[in-house]
A protein has these predicted regions:
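Catalytic domains of riboflavin
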Residues: 1-371
Length: 371
């Protein structure tokens, strides 16, 4: 039971209804006490009052989530040539409305900039750079592809019948630290806001949508034993990914799982590559020893330059302190492949890292297996 001074998590339909009505909502990754939250508003409904509320009470950076298609239409370049953000947040160059603003920083000016960016007939010359609004480019496939607030903002706005764009702002406490779920529940009660989760949004969408299509199945003989291999087409990126399945299990069983990304031709040649916490050979050997498990081999479309970098040993490792979560380009694809293979509970082979939204796919990490 929640007290009268806090707010419980609302179902996705209620969050969408508030977005459709032009109300601000709070969005967290999932129902976990440590989760931070963002204020989210469908960009079509932006007002100076809404921007002022975010600036006064949210206190974080006010951003505008946009689809890749809209960013390309507006000719918004990436903020930096190499994105070093741990969460893969895709900032573009900051923007300002070309007309109708003064200094650009006032609530009214920022609302005007958002309106200019999401207008039906918006053109690149309707905006100038830099400015006081920070666009974020969502990945194709939305939260099914990347479990981020950027994608959730676009998805929820689209589900509400609005332009797939949202104004978002992180919520901080009075002392400048990030508000966590218990703080957010009190904040929501004080301001009459609903709280939703990205995990619920993923579950809602994945019930009726899929990022993958199984295109082939056959038995494959490896040096460590026989596996059933499945090939999947990645609908957003059109790549082909593989899963290697060993044995059978009950829905409640925790099985060994290795998500191997990015898949490189060199993985099949070198058994001691430093690119991965588990080599492909070691992964298959461990799964065979367990008698059951799944290895998902994600193909990230390795370019000639990337292959050369791996050959020369200059590519970044797929594990280590800077890699806190799965590859964000293929996160949802890997999750849907695991679900299609019958995985519900897993012992993940690799170093512990944050994996937001997995509950939305019906997946639970029971533990981690490190070498």
């Amino acid at each position: 039971m929640t007290s009268p001074d806090t707010v419980a998590i609302s179902p996705v339909d209620d969050i969408v209804a508030d977005m459709r009505a032009g109300r601000i909502v709070i969005l967290v990754d999932e129902e976990d006490r440590e989760n931070e939250g963002d204020l989210v508003l469908a960009a079509d409904h932006v007002t100076a009052e809404a921007i002022n509320f975010m600036a006064r009470y949210g206190r974080g950076l006010i951003c505008l989530t946009l689809t890749r298609e809209r960013c390309e239409h507006l000719q918004l370049p990436p903020m930096t040539a190499r994105n070093g953000d741990k969460k893969g947040t895709a900032f573009t160059a900051s923007i300002e409305a070309a007309e109708g603003v003064t200094t650009g920083i006032s609530a009214a000016d920022r609302a005007r900039t958002v309106q200019a960016a999401v207008a039906l007939g918006a053109k690149p010359n309707d905006l100038v750079q830099p400015g006081h609004i920070f666009p974020l480019q969502a990945v194709d496939g939305g939260v099914l592809m990347r479990a981020g607030h950027t994608e959730a903002g676009c998805d929820l706005a689209a589900m509400a019948g609005c332009t797939p764009a949202a104004v978002i702002c992180e919520i901080m406490k009075d002392d400048g630290t990030m508000a966590r779920l218990p703080d957010l529940q009190v904040f929501a009660a004080q301001h009459g806001l609903k709280i939703g989760t990205i995990a619920d949004l993923i579950e809602h969408r994945s019930r009726v949508e899929s990022l993958i299509e199984k295109v082939g199945t056959r038995t494959i003989q490896t040096a460590y034993g026989e596996f059933t291999a499945h090939a999947y087409r990645d609908k957003p990126a059109h790549g082909i990914h593989l899963s290697l399945v060993k044995g059978e299990w009950a829905p409640h069983d925790a099985v060994a799982v290795r998500v191997h990304e990015p898949l490189s031709v060199l993985d099949a040649l070198e058994t001691n590559r430093a690119m991965h916490s588990w080599s492909l050979d070691a992964s298959l050997a461990h799964i065979c020893a367990q008698g059951k498990g799944v290895a998902v081999l994600l193909n990230c479309g390795e370019s000639a330059a990337q292959l050369l970098a791996q050959f020369a040993g200059t590519a970044r490792a797929a594990h280590g302190p800077e890699r806190e979560r799965m590859d964000l380009r293929t996160y949802g694809v890997g999750a849907q492949i695991l679900r299609d293979c019958g995985v519900h509970r897993m012992n993940l082979m690799g170093s512990p890292r944050r994996s937001p939204g997995l509950t939305g796919y019906g997946l639970e990490i029971v533990g981690y297996i490190t070498q």
